[in-house]
């Protein structure tokens, strides 16, 4: 027993910050983001790239790599099966990726519970919004009249949310996919090419405060566990359900916003380097300089720990089979997740 304890102590010494400094010194850590340039995921990743290195022994440099496409699936697959597993690559992937796995999304080659989650910047309700000049003024109007809603790919939460609302609540969103990034989709909304989209509320605050100031958009519904203080009169989609089954399906669909903007390391990352990355991620989110820069960019930070985010993702993955199956069938009938 004493020999075993000694081995554990020696292993701890090998995994010490001093040993890690030998590895990280003069290295560059890549942050892969599953979105294009200009969105809130990209902005937050670039903010981390400027600060996180200060909390890693050896003070490595950081670079952001945008890898959009496939409704965020391309980057997530890359992190699972292709990226280096040496502690020099981390990622922020869209919070719909665990849900996408549960629902059997097209092209998925990852298992969310096999990633090493570092934490998250905090929960963020999504909203369904329309241009203020659209004839649709309430969610009930969207149940009576068709409205063009822009999105990226079939596996994205930007598609899943309105698709689920169409099938469960009877809304008539005509989902137009194919936009390469959130910013490209915003331009389409500005031009009137589409009249509606799903969006993280904090992204609107950080990227388009002018939309709020000039009342360019109107909010029809929000997706999350509780109403935002800023939107007390905008209903949650779960509040619109009329049966327990509908409520269960919409609760599952509403799970991604609670994950916020999660960060991960790929399976196989060495435990000592993973511990350093998790500690650095946590320390960065408490750092006054980081928080000051985040506030200047209108980026909210309400940290979720590695342990918490891991449990939240496991809860999604282990959704009751009947609810997962009904949701999967429902979305397939609606045109999503064809394989």
Question: Where would I find each of the regions flagged by the language model?
Answer:
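N-terminal signal peptide c-region/cleavage motif recognized by signal peptidases
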Residues: 15-19
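Short beta-strand and adjacent tight-turn residues that come in two discontinuous sequence segments
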Residues: 92-93, 152, 178-180, 198-200, ...
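Ligand-binding clamshell of periplasmic/extracellular solute-binding protein-like
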Residues: 48, 70-73, 87-99, 120-122, ...
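Sec-dependent N-terminal signal peptides
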Residues: 5-14
């Amino acid at each position: 027993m004493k020999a075993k304890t000694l081995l554990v102590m020696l292993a701890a010494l090998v995994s010490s910050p001093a040993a890690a400094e030998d590895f990280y010194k003069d290295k560059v850590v890549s942050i892969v983001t599953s979105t294009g340039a200009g969105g809130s995921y990209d902005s937050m990743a670039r903010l981390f790239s400027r600060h996180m290195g200060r909390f890693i022994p050896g003070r490595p440099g950081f670079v952001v790599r945008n890898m959009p496409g496939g409704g965020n699936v391309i980057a997530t697959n890359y992190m699972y099966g292709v990226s280096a597993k040496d502690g020099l690559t981390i990622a922020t992937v869209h919070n719909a990726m665990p849900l996408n796995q549960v629902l059997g999304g097209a092209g998925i080659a990852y298992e969310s519970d096999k990633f090493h989650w570092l934490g998250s910047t905090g929960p963020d309700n999504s909203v369904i919004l329309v241009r203020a000049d659209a004839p649709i003024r309430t969610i009930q109007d969207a149940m009576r009249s068709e409205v063009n809603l822009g999105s990226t790919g079939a596996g994205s939460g930007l598609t899943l949310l309105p698709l689920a609302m169409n099938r469960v609540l009877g809304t008539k969103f005509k989902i137009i996919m194919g936009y390469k990034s959130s910013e490209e989709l915003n331009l389409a909304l500005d031009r009137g090419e589409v009249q509606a989209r799903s969006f993280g509320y904090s992204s609107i605050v950080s990227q388009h405060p002018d939309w709020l100031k000039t009342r360019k958009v109107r909010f029809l519904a929000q997706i999350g566990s509780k109403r935002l203080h800023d939107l007390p009169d905008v209903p949650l989609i779960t509040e619109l359900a009329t049966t327990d089954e509908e409520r269960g399906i919409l609760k599952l669909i509403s799970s991604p916003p609670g994950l916020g903007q999660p960060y991960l390391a790929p399976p196989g990352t060495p435990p000592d380097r993973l511990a350093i990355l998790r500690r650095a991620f946590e320390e960065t989110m408490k750092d006054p300089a980081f928080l000051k820069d985040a506030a200047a960019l209108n980026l909210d930070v309400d940290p979720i720990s590695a342990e918490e985010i891991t449990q939240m993702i496991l809860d999604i993955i282990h959704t009751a089979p009947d609810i997962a199956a009904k949701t999967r069938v429902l979305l397939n009938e609606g045109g999503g997740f064809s394989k």
